[in-house]
């Protein structure tokens, strides 16, 4: 695996999770299956299918800053990036920004209580978590 080349440290999985739980992560970049207006994120149960969170919980809940990255929608979206900006030829069939997520894998309320800084980045816009919910802070040029 390419990521194992020139490693600064190779540690057992158990020790890695202890590092996560101990607050060793300053910033993490994670994918998002869907997010809602409150800032909650779901990666564990999508379209009625149980996927499971894996190590997502330990990483997302214990990092000081969390940056969620994902597309605005899924399945069939056609987007071009040109010198003039973003061109959306076709939106996807499955929205990923929803009123309420199917299951809460990342709790925005817990993040607020913990003092985490949280950003949500899509190809169309950037949002941040505030006390009032999710705030739009940047729109991609188009």
Segments (PLM) and residue ranges:
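Conserved phosphate- and dinucleotide-binding cores of soluble alpha/beta proteins
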Residues: 1-141
């Amino acid at each position: 695996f390419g990521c194992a080349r020139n490693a600064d440290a190779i540690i057992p999985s158990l020790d890695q999770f202890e590092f996560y739980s101990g607050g060793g992560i300053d910033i993490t970049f994670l994918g998002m299956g869907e997010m809602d207006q409150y800032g909650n994120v779901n990666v564990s149960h999508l379209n009625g299918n149980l996927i499971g969170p894996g190590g997502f919980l330990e990483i997302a809940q214990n990092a000081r800053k969390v940056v969620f990255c994902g597309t605005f929608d899924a399945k069939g979206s056609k987007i071009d990036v040109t010198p003039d900006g973003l061109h959306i030829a076709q939106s996807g069939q499955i929205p990923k920004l929803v009123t309420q997520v199917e299951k809460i894998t990342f709790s925005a309320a817990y993040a607020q209580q913990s003092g985490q800084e949280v950003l949500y980045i899509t190809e169309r816009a950037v949002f941040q978590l505030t006390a009032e919910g999710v705030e739009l802070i940047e729109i991609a040029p188009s």
